[in-house]
Amino acid sequence: MKGYSMSVDENNARARIVEADISLKDAVNIAHHIRGMKLDYAKQILEDVVSKKYAIPYFRYLDSVSHRPGKGPGRYPVKAAKVFIDLLSNVENNAEFKGMNTDSLIIKHVAANKGRMIKKYTPKAYGRAGANFKDLINLEVIVTEGDQ
């Protein structure tokens, strides 16, 4: 399947967001946290992250990440959580279009990868130029029907 890191069969639904302007570090930690969850529960967690009621526990990029009560190091990545909510809504609509039961969907695969880099240069004094690079992020999710 072009563009996806794993192949899917007919009883799976998939969705992608290409070149999202979010932090790679936040996206990797959110993807790790929601992998294997039921789709409705993952969407509820991400909505709680947006309202800053639930902290995403960080497993990677932990330098100077503060401890959260009962979870260890974590943060509230609001901007990335909004993009993941859109991604999960897209895959839910795709599953509904394929005739799958949307109440029993389980996140089988979710990944966040580096996309294209936007290169900007800011003029500085004495003819120099300062680099201002930004990485864009590619997200993908695959869901399957689970047992009820």
Curated annotation (Swiss-Prot):
Part of the 50S ribosomal subunit. This is Large ribosomal subunit protein uL22. One of its GO terms (cellular component) is cytosolic large ribosomal subunit. One of its GO terms (biological process) is cytoplasmic translation. GO terms for molecular function: rRNA binding; structural constituent of ribosome. InterPro entries: Ribosomal_uL22, Ribosomal_uL22_euk/arc, Ribosomal_uL22_sf. Keywords: Ribonucleoprotein, Ribosomal protein, RNA-binding, rRNA-binding. This protein binds specifically to 23S rRNA. It makes multiple contacts with different domains of the 23S rRNA in the assembled 50S subunit and ribosome. The globular domain of the protein is located near the polypeptide exit tunnel on the outside of the subunit, while an extended beta-hairpin is found that lines the wall of the exit tunnel in the center of the 70S ribosome. Belongs to the universal ribosomal protein uL22 family. It comes from Thermoplasma volcanium (strain ATCC 51530 / DSM 4299 / JCM 9571 / NBRC 15438 / GSS1). It holds the Pfam family Ribosomal_L22. SUPFAM superfamilies: Ribosomal protein L22 (SSF54843). The keyword rRNA-binding applies.
